[in-house]
């Protein structure tokens, strides 16, 4: 019998805002957001839990945030500091394992299957890591521990902030059976509503469904949905994996038929893409990102992707791609639009060097 894996998902608690409060204790207990401007331009990068009580969240327009929370304290982004602290956290991870998959500055998977520290207990390893982050860096982290990658990520959100949750091999089957499908990665509002219309609310419902029907109805994602609902997730923790691309997409509440509607959606997606690029990798000229792609998924769940090398990342270039790929609709409705960008080759190499 194969060895049961021990996977930990670590997620820092409102990372950027927490660092700012650590650096300036006068901010503690007050609603704080990182990013945006007092003039109301831009969007929030993140905010602390006091601000979230007012309904604030990352990527919210600053003007809207200030209306909801007039006393909101805005702090400028300090990416060099966040990166330095992130590297300190990564060094703590590597005291226990070299199999670390970095998802962003504040999130990572760890495979501790072969770790002998803490008598091999993944639960105690996660606790020690969180204790070290607090004692050495005065920041809090949440953790999820499970035999499967997707379950570890779900578990890290169960007792947030500053907590951890364990899904053991013994209780994994029961946990998955009752798990709401909206908790599955990539099941957004629209997909969840479609599932609900079919009477599918939990993984248990998927288990009692017809496999061919799930595959046909949800396409490639149907396979992932079926496998997760049956406790199948063979994805490895990809140590030292540099991110080669970044994508954003929007599954639409209702299908669209017209190019003008799609252009409006691309406008919003482009803003999100730039926001995420700046959040994860700091200030970098958009002209350095030359390999762009756009994806359309149609009402029949088939999809098409168009990729081009251009003179730089811009809204106009994505609109041009959209106009070209729209010719492939063949009178079909569109239910999803996605934008993606590949990092420059030297950027990928630099990430790899940092993580080696």
From Swiss-Prot:
Reactions it catalyzes: DNA(n) + a 2'-deoxyribonucleoside 5'-triphosphate = DNA(n+1) + diphosphate
Enzyme Commission number(s): 2.7.7.7
GO molecular function: damaged DNA binding; DNA-directed DNA polymerase activity; magnesium ion binding
Pfam assignment, any one: IMS_HHH_1
Keyword DNA-binding in annotation: yes
Catalytic EC class: transferase
Main location group: cytoplasm
Alphabetically ordered keywords of this record: Cytoplasm, DNA damage, DNA repair, DNA replication, DNA-binding, DNA-directed DNA polymerase, Magnesium, Metal-binding, Mutator protein, Nucleotidyltransferase, Transferase
Entry's localization field: Cytoplasm
Source superkingdom: Bacteria
Residues under site feature: Substrate discrimination: 16
Residues where Mg(2+) binds: 11, 106
Any one biological process term the GO annotation gives: DNA-templated DNA replication
Cofactor(s) this protein requires: Mg(2+)
PROSITE patterns reported for this sequence: UMUC (PS50173)
GO CC terms, sorted: cytosol
Domain UmuC span(s) in chain numbering: 7-188
Cofactor note: Binds 2 magnesium ions per subunit.
Family of the protein in this entry: Belongs to the DNA polymerase type-Y family.
Main function: Poorly processive, error-prone DNA polymerase involved in untargeted mutagenesis. Copies undamaged DNA at stalled replication forks, which arise in vivo from mismatched or misaligned primer ends. These misaligned primers can be extended by PolIV. Exhibits no 3'-5' exonuclease (proofreading) activity. May be involved in translesional synthesis, in conjunction with the beta clamp from PolIII.
The protein's assembly and partners: Monomer.
Descriptive protein name: DNA polymerase IV
Organism: Actinobacillus pleuropneumoniae serotype 5b (strain L20)
């Amino acid at each position: 019998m194969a060895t049961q894996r021990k996977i930990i998902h670590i997620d820092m608690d409102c990372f950027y805002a927490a660092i700012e409060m650590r650096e300036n204790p006068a901010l503690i207990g007050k609603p704080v957001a990182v990013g945006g401007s007092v003039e109301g331009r831009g969007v929030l990068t993140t905010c602390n839990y006091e601000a979230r009580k007012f309904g604030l969240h990352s990527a919210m327009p600053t003007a809207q945030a200030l209306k909801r929370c007039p006393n909101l304290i805005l702090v400028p982004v300090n990416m060099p500091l966040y990166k330095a602290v992130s590297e300190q956290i990564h060094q703590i991870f590597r005291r226990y394992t070299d199999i670390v998959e970095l998802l962003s500055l504040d999130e990572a998977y760890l495979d501790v299957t072969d770790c002998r520290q803490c008598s091999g207990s993944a639960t105690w390893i996660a606790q020690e890591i969180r204790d070290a982050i607090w004692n050495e860096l005065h920041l809090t982290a949440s953790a999820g521990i499970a035999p499967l990658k997707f379950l570890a990520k779900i578990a890290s959100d169960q007792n947030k902030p500053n907590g951890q949750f364990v899904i053991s091999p013994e209780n994994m089957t029961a946990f998955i059976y009752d798990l709401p499908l909206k908790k599955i990665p990539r099941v957004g509002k629209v997909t969840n509503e479609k599932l609900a219309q079919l009477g599918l609310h939990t993984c248990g419902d998927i288990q009692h469904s017809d496999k061919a029907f799930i595959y046909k109805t949800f396409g490639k994602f149907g396979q992932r949905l079926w496998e997760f609902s049956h406790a199948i997730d063979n994805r490895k923790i990809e140590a030292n994996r540099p991110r080669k691309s970044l994508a954003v997409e929007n599954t639409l509440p209702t299908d669209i038929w017209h190019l003008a509607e799609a252009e409006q959606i691309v406008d919003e997606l482009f803003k999100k893409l730039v926001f995420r690029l700046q959040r994860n990798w700091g200030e970098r000229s958009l002209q350095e990102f030359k390999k762009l792609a756009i994806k359309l998924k149609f009402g029949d769940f088939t999809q098409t992707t168009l990729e081009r090398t251009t003179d730089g990342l811009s809204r106009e270039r994505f609109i041009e791609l959209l106009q070209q790929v729209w010719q492939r609709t063949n009178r079909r409705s569109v239910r999803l639009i996605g934008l993606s960008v590949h990092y420059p080759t030297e950027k990928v190499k630099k990430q790899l060097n940092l993580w080696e």
